[in-house]
Amino acid sequence: ADVPGNYPLDSYGNCYPCTILGDNQYCI
């Protein structure tokens, strides 16, 4: 799951860069 916030998106609409912990995706 993406954490809402101001972050760039990759071509799949996922935050990048990010760190994935379990089922959670933390945008950094």
Swiss-Prot record:
GO cellular component entries: extracellular region
Main location: secreted
Transmembrane spans: none
Domain of life: Eukaryota
Keyword Transit peptide: no
Keyword entries, A-Z: Ion channel impairing toxin, Neurotoxin, Secreted, Toxin, Voltage-gated sodium channel impairing toxin
Function, as annotated: Binds to sodium channels (Nav) and affects the channel activation process.
Family: Belongs to the long (3 C-C) scorpion toxin superfamily.
Protein name: Toxin a
Tissues expressing the protein: Expressed by the venom gland.
GO terms for MF: ion channel inhibitor activity; sodium channel regulator activity; toxin activity
Limits of the LCN-type CS-alpha/beta domain: 3-28
